Amino acid sequence: MEKKYRFYLVNAFGLPEGSRYAHRSLKGPKEEVLMNYDNVKHLLADVEWDLHNGAIASYGDWPVENREEFGLAAAARIPLVREGCESGKYNAIVLLGGGEPGFNESREIGRKFNIPVTACGHSQMHFATMLGNKFSVIDMAESHNMYYYNLIIQHRMDHRCASIRNINYPLPRPGGDESRSIPKEKKKALAGEHSDMVETAVTEAVAAIEEDGAEVITFGCSALFWLQPFLQKRLTELGWEIPVLEGYSCAIELAKAMVNLGVDASGLTFPVDHPKKIRRKKTF
């Protein structure tokens, strides 16, 4: 029996095999390639899903982090979204990656096929604003912070965002500090060992609550999404009754909600090439 949900999950970028800067699996079964699959497999149990591991990055063999790289990643991902929509196999597209390159362009494509497109940052922000007055973002590097800052403004969430807190664990790239390794810190945490990265995230989350007024915690880069259960547990143990969200879960669940509602996006926000009606004026 065909499942109700048929999703195409598309990573933000891919890296060539053998890249020394890879921070996630580059090949293998989809369950092994999808980061933090164990944290979202219960949400995918009722979904027929395929995964594209992302178009190979054109800027180099390291993960995307700054504006130039995000622009190139967006241009490479958009054709994958169109292919997914044209295939007729899917009723939603889920864009993986916290910085959501190509999201608005993908929504425009999806609208033409009546297919909703969701992304991690957008989904987290909207769920967060349903749960509390203001949210803070735990993020990993200065350049990514400022890219994400603009993303928050683009989604008109600047009045609901308390702060972006930088834990300073940049993604691997040429000339970077290899001692501050996200994969190594993740491995320690999963093994039940002390992780400086987890401790830093806890410190910054508490500061976001006490100093910035955050009532919900979210994440910027998807390389940090694995922190969600660790941070949620630690904050609860400290007595903070605050939800901690991560992007994959939010994007998957928002896609389900949109399929259930039979909506994709407003045709006034994303008009087709030859709309039946036009507006003479757009106000702010």
Give, region by region, the residue ranges found by the protein language model.
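Short beta-strand segments enriched in small/hydrophobic residues
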Residues: 2-33, 55, 135-139
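N-terminal beta-loop-helix "entrance" segment that forms/cooperates
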Residues: 48-74, 175-176
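Active-site rim beta-loop-alpha module in soluble metabolic enzymes
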Residues: 151-220
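Short, acidic/small-residue loops that bind anionic groups at enzyme active sites
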Residues: 107-131, 233-252
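Short, glycine-/small-residue-rich phosphate/pyrophosphate-handling segment
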Residues: 126-168, 256-284
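Glycine/small-residue-rich loop that forms an oxyanion/phosphate-binding "nest" at active or ligand-binding sites
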Residues: 78-127
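Glycine-rich, highly charged phosphate/nucleotide-binding loops
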Residues: 65-83, 195-204
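Periplasmic-binding protein-like
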Residues: 87-97, 214-222, 245
